[in-house]
Amino acid sequence: MPGRRRQKRTEASKIDATPPWETRARAEPDVTTGPYDERDAPDDELERIDLGALRIPIDGGFDVQVEVNEVQQVIAATLAGPHGTVQLGVFAAPRNEGIWNEVRAEIAESLRGQRRPVPSEKEGPFGTELHGTIPDDTGRGTVPVRFVGVDGPRWFLRALFAGPVATDDTAAEPFEQALRGVVVVRGTEPLPVREPVPLQLPTGVELPNPGS
């Protein structure tokens, strides 16, 4: 089912538990199509940049940028191309319960409170999405946005498409393909629900000194 990454492992467990004397037909498990939990990641040849909790394909013709908070922790990654950006963030979530429905409702409420066109829900390749607008860099105009959410085991991945990639299927396609190839490495550290899962810079890369 789109938007949920546990299907393959759960269904496989059910099949393995079927007694051998039962002869009823058994359906094949659904195949996870990505984004992937690290346990279900495919053995493919995609080159990925390793940001710790996120491993992102880098052959889509876009730049991968990182965003940091006030204490210089990497909290999000942005795929930037000529037709817009896609910001990726991974957050802690319950083990057996998705939070995208709740998060989506809260984002919609926030957008409605900004006196802009009412955001709308649409079905997309990753499940139910939220479409709306946010202020542009000048503060005088708006930018179309598209929020995508994927629930995984103890993690939630949010992708924010901004610019033409939010409304143009052709412009969005390479970004969607990259999103399908993302691997989430949640780790075992206990974190409050919705807390950003810390990312890290690739080996050998350092942030510039903010005082320089």
Regions found by a protein language model. Name each.
Residues G3-R4, E22, R26-L51, P57-V143, ...:
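Conserved polar/disulfide-associated segments of primarily extracytoplasmic proteins
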Residues R4, K8-D16, L201-S212:
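Compositionally biased, intrinsically disordered low-complexity segments enriched in polar/Pro/Gly
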Residues D37, D50-G52, D151, V185, ...:
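Generic, ordered loop/turn and secondary-structure boundary motif
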Residues F62, L160-S212:
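Surface-exposed amphipathic alpha-helical segments
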Residues P144-G149:
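Hydrophobic/aromatic beta-strand elements that line small-molecule binding cavities or substrate pockets
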Residues V150-A162:
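Short acidic, glycine/tyrosine-flanked loop/strand segments centered on an H-E-D-like triad
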